[in-house]
Amino acid sequence: IEMYEKFHLKRNLKLQQNYIAQIEFGIRASDSIEKAKKSVLEILRQKHPPTAIFASNDVLALAVLKAAFELKICVPKNLSLIGMDDIFSASASTPAITTVSKERYKLGQLSAKRLIYKLSNVDLELPERILMSCGLLERGTVSAPFNI
């Protein structure tokens, strides 16, 4: 959400707060999908709904797909969608979700190394910022805006 806000501020664009939904995850993914779908339905039923949605993870992107299907909104013709994480369900959905892929294996390795280092150096605090590469896996949920 922070990047969405910064993007708009930097370009002097009106921030559409009514396009933002913060979803708290439950224990079960299916509960989270249903909760997210309800929020997305509210957004998509607005007088001027968005033509694109960036979901902070692929589970939420699946909820967007369900909401769009329920409202008979054609993805990607009338709504583009991008998720994040490249979970298996993203490639198995119909249409397959365009997603940002992170290097999960490398992230796991770095996390384990940091944890082991921290456990052996308990009093040592080393704030560290690690930037990792990611890539866009373009699949079936994005297209050029239809109203241009």
Where are these regions (language model features)?
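Flexible loop/turn connectors
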Residues: 39-148
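Short beta-strand elements in bilobed, periplasmic/extracellular small-molecule ligand-binding domains
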Residues: 1, 5-33
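Adenosine-nucleotide cofactor-binding segment
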Residues: 36
